[in-house]
Amino acid sequence: MKKKKVISTLGVIALSASLVTPVFAQQPETSPGTPDEQVLSVEGFTNHEQLGKKLQQIAKSSQGKVQVEVAGYSNRGREIYKATVGQGDKVILLESEIHGNEPTGTEAILNILQFLGTNSPEAQKIREEVTIVALPKMNPDASELSRRGNDLTWAEVVEDFPQLASVRPTWNYYIYQNQTFDYASQPGFDVNRDFNPNLDYVPQPEDFPGNSSQPGWFITPESQVVRDVYKDLQAEFGKVDVFVDLHHQAPYYEVEGTDDLVTFSISGQFVPDPSTTEKYAEYADTYDYDFSRQLNVAVFDALQEKGNANISLYPQGLDLPGTALGTFALNGSGAVLFEVRGQTQSMGQKKKGELVKAVERGLYGIINGVADGTVYDINPEEYESIPLTKGRQ
């Protein structure tokens, strides 16, 4: 991996200007009722070049409060940025656009970084209590292509891992073509199935091609960068208290018991509880499902306070250890999934402002709850009362 480049908050070194779904990743990225042939504008979302410039501006205007660096590089050599703000003992790791057609999380992260870099008393209090680390647009190759999968061929994987020369490609390797996406000529992987709860795992031929209920392999550069950031935080702080992954889903799900379209769904369950199954027994001492549930309730409550009741619970009973959320939950992080309404191929930038603001409010529910300690007083059983998502199975 290329050496990290530190970005000066004074602008001396300029930035380069260049879940999760419970279905098999090989399936096309379309959903019933989704317009496949429309050309929808996405220019209102921040692209990779703009991201670098915006982060530089935030770092400079914060006068050192927000630190930005290049944590690593995508397969096509694009920077994967890491922004850090705060000096508290509790660590919150935020990640967006592990799927490149799911962009609202990046906008929300930028807005939060902008605020937390100010001299506001509220921002100062948060900085004193927590350390927030953000990986916005962590799959930039996919983002530039406005698609789910990254830009990586199986041949390139074998070049990096020669021990895999005789095995079949992984189950999450996209090579299909439909009206919306052409992976046949430009293959890629669902990076969110490439994680492994053993953070020191080295790919072994017998673990391929795998399936959704088995761990991933860290064969993509993007997952390797996130893993390394996570491990560095573990080494520095002892643990990563909270991990939040910001996703999108199809546009027309409803809140159970209503006709209201879901603004976004949330979840804290990605693998079976290690205390109840031998499969993950080695992680029983680190896994903290109650804390994940408390964090999710904090998100739900934050949106209710603002009058947005269209928050639902994502399908439960999942076993997805290859997701970032599954992997980091097993490693002891309280884990939260956001699944925002509509991907770029189905909605473009429609309702962008409304959806970004909702994500921000949900994230502040977590940030404030951890900073002031109120999240630890939440009854985790309240999670079970969050309405389900009608139409998801």
Model-derived segments and spans:
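C-terminal accessory segments enriched in acidic
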Residues: M1-K3, Q27-N47, D207-Q393
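Sec-dependent N-terminal signal peptides
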Residues: K5-S16
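Sec-dependent signal peptide cleavage junction
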Residues: A17-S31
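Soluble metallo-hydrolase cores and metallopeptidase-like ectodomains found primarily
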Residues: E43-K90
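Loop/turn elements at helix/coil->beta-strand transitions in domains of secreted/extracellular proteins
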Residues: G64-Q67, R78, G88-V91, E128-V133, ...
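Active-site-proximal beta-strand/loop segments in catalytic clefts of secreted hydrolases
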Residues: A71-Y73, V85, E95-I98, L135-N139, ...
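Active-site/substrate-binding loop(s) of hydrolase catalytic cores
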Residues: D89, T104, G117-T118, E122-Y280
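Membrane-embedded segments
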Residues: T104-T106, L110
